[in-house]
C-alpha cells in the first residue's frame, strides 16, 4: 500500500479527502498505482509510485507526483479506474484544486462539472470575542465515549442534503477520533436550555491551519444566528495557538453559508470541482 501522505505538498490542496483515507485504511476502497517511470534517484532507489488513484463509492480521486507530471500518468490512472469491473468503475471524480491538467482530462473523457467546493480562509483573530450564547444555552467540549450518538444524530439532520458529511457513520467518527489531529476540546457542543444538542463546531488543527471541519445547526433552529455563535466560539478557540490562518470548506452554491462566512472575514483560497461522467 503506498503512503498517500507522501503525495501531500505544502502549496497544493490535499489530493484525497479524509473519508477516502478512512476507507483506504479500512479496506473499503480500490487503490491503483502507477509505478515509478524513472530508473531511480542518484542512489538508484525508486522514489515510489508516480501516481495513485483511489476509487470509493463510485468516486475517483487521483494524484501524480510533481516530478512525474506531464508524462500521461494521470490519463493511465483514469483508464485503469474506468476499466474496473463489477460496477466499481467511477461515475464521479474530484479535482482538488481544479488544475488545468484535471480539466484537460475531464474534457478528454467528456466529464462535466457538477459541484464546486470552495476553501475559504481568514486570519486568526488576535483575541477572541464573546460568542453571544442564547440565554440558557451552554457550550462544552465533546466527550469521547459519551457524545458520539448525540453528535451523529445532529450531524445527519444538519447535513441531510450533503452527500459526504451527512452520511458519516459511527465507524467514520471513531476513525477520526483516532487521527493525530483530533482533540475533543476542538469539537464544541452547543446545548439549549433543555440540554438538547442544538449545534456544534468541529475544528481540525493541523499543519498551521485551523479548519472549521464541520459547523452544524439543528434544522429547527437554523436561521436564528446560531451559526454565527458557533463560528465566533470556534475562532476564539483558535486564538493564541500560533496558526497561520483559519479555513473552511463550503459548497459553491450555498449562498446562506457563504454570506455567513464572508461576514466573518473569510475569502476564497482554493476550489475543488466534482466532475460527472456522461450518461
Placement of each model-derived feature along the sequence:
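C-terminal "cap" of GNAT-fold acetyltransferases
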Residues: 119-143, 247-255, 265, 271-279
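Conserved active-site alpha-helix within GNAT-family acetyltransferase domains
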Residues: 75-76, 97-116, 223-224, 228, ...
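Acyl-donor-binding surface of acyltransferase catalytic domains
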Residues: 35-36, 42-43, 49, 56-59, ...
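Conserved hydrophobic beta-strand within the GNAT/NAT acetyltransferase core sheet
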Residues: 60-62, 91-95, 212, 246-250
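A conserved beta-strand-loop-helix scaffold within acyl/acetyltransferase catalytic domains
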Residues: 20-26, 53-58, 164, 168-216
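A short beta-loop-alpha structural element at the N-terminal edge
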Residues: 1-9, 138-153
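A short, internal acetyl-CoA/4′-phosphopantetheine-binding micro-motif in the GNAT/acyltransferase core
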Residues: 58-71, 215-222, 251
Amino acid at each position: 500500500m503506498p503512503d498517500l501522505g507522501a503525495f501531500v505538498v505544502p502549496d497544493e490542496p490535499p489530493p484525497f479527502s479524509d473519508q477516502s483515507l478512512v476507507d483506504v485504511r479500512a479496506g473499503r476502497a480500490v487503490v491503483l498505482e502507477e509505478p515509478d517511470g524513472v530508473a531511480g534517484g542518484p542512489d538508484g532507489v525508486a522514489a515510489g509510485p508516480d501516481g495513485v488513484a483511489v476509487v470509493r463509492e463510485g468516486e475517483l480521486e487521483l494524484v501524480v507526483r510533481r516530478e512525474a507530471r506531464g508524462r500521461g500518468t494521470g490519463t493511465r490512472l483514469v483508464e485503469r479506474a474506468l476499466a474496473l469491473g463489477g460496477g466499481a468503475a467511477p461515475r464521479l471524480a474530484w479535482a482538488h484544486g481544479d488544475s488545468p491538467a484535471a480539466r484537460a482530462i475531464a474534457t478528454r473523457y467528456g466529464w462535466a462539472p457538477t459541484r464546486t467546493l470552495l476553501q475559504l480562509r481568514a486570519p486568526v483573530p488576535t483575541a477572541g470575542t464573546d460568542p453571544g450564547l442564547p440565554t440558557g444555552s451552554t457550550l462544552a467540549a465533546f466527550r469521547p465515549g459519551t457524545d458520539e450518538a448525540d453528535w451523529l444524530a445532529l450531524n445527519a439532520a444538519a447535513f441531510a442534503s450533503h452527500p459526504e458529511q451527512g452520511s458519516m457513520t459511527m465507524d467514520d467518527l471513531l476513525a477520526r477520533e483516532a487521527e493525530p489531529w483530533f482533540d475533543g476540546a476542538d469539537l464544541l457542543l452547543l446545548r439549549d436550555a433543555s440540554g438538547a444538542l442544538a449545534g456544534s463546531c468541529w475544528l481540525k488543527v493541523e499543519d498551521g491551519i485551523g479548519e472549521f471541519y464541520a459547523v452544524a445547526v439543528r434544522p429547527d433552529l437554523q436561521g436564528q444566528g446560531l451559526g454565527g455563535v458557533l463560528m465566533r466560539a470556534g475562532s476564539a478557540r483558535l486564538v493564541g495557538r500560533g496558526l497561520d490562518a483559519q479555513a473552511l470548506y463550503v459548497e459553491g452554491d450555498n449562498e446562506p453559508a457563504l454570506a455567513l462566512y464572508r461576514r466573518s472575514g473569510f475569502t476564497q483560497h482554493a476550489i475543488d470541482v466534482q466532475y460527472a461522467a456522461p450518461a
